[in-house]
Design a protein with these regions (language model features):
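Secretory targeting signatures
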Residues: 1-21
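Extracytoplasmic/secreted envelope proteins and their assembly/folding machinery
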Residues: 44, 68-75, 103, 142, ...
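Loop/turn elements at helix/coil->beta-strand transitions in domains of secreted/extracellular proteins
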Residues: 48-53, 81-86, 113-118, 149-151, ...
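Short pre-active-site segment immediately N-terminal to redox-active cysteine/selenocysteine motifs
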Residues: 49-52, 57-60, 94
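Solvent-exposed coil/turn segments that connect beta secondary-structure elements
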Residues: 59, 92-93, 124-125, 158-159, ...
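Structural microenvironment flanking redox-active thiols in thiol-disulfide oxidoreductases
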Residues: 65-116, 120-130
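Thiol-/selenol-based redox modules, centered on thioredoxin-like
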Residues: 138-144, 148-187
Length: 187
């Protein structure tokens, strides 16, 4: 009996398709600045242009401010690449930090840590979506990304799949190189 089961497993093992991760995206309210390109950010629309680097931020997070400043130094060069490496900052603690707090810290050229890319403001109720049809799924955006702390970064390929992540609190001398290497692997 065991022999028959073993033979069946061996013979049928090639018949099973490996599971591939399905892409996920989000559509979320922004600060509605010029840099946000509208009041709602669609990751699916942005992925049609190129990969997206997601940075979870908080107003009181020192590491988030350091990451923002480091990423800002490379943002224009990354946007000039083909395809561009886009960035979106995701406010993590909207229950405790107001939209105005986020705008003051990150939203304006005169802000301490100006962010020249979209900033989105998800709530705990905003759902992650399937990339094909943008249907809302049962997980929230935060749940899908593993209830991230701040700062936390994820590189999303053009299929909506997470291909790299970093939970390093402060960027170091290798951080930008890591991001650029991950980008090269997904294009």
């Amino acid at each position: 009996m065991r022999f028959v089961a073993l033979v069946l497993v061996v013979l049928l093992s090639g018949c099973i398709n490996p599971t591939t991760e399905e892409g996920r995206v989000f559509t979320i309210e922004t600060l509605d600045r010029v840099e946000d390109a509208g009041s709602v950010y669609s990751m699916k629309d942005n992925l049609s242009e190129g990969p997206v680097l997601v940075l979870f931020i908080g107003v009181g997070c020192i590491g988030c401010k350091d990451w923002t400043d480091d990423l800002r130094e490379h943002h224009n060069d990354w946007m000039d690449q083909e395809p561009p490496l886009q960035i979106v900052s995701v406010e993590r603690y909207l229950r405790f930090e107001t939209k105005e707090d986020v705008a003051e810290e990150f939203g304006f050229p005169e802000s301490n840590h100006y962010t020249p890319w979209p900033i989105v403001l998800p709530t705990d109720d905003d759902s992650i979506q399937r990339i094909e049809d943008q249907a809302n799924l049962s997980q929230s955006v935060f749940e899908y990304y593993g209830l991230p702390g701040t700062p936390e970064l994820f590189l999303i390929d053009q299929e909506g799949v997470i291909r790299w992540e970093s939970s390093t609190y402060y960027p170091d001398q290798n951080s930008i190189e890591e991001i650029e290497n991950a980008y090269k692997k997904v294009i």
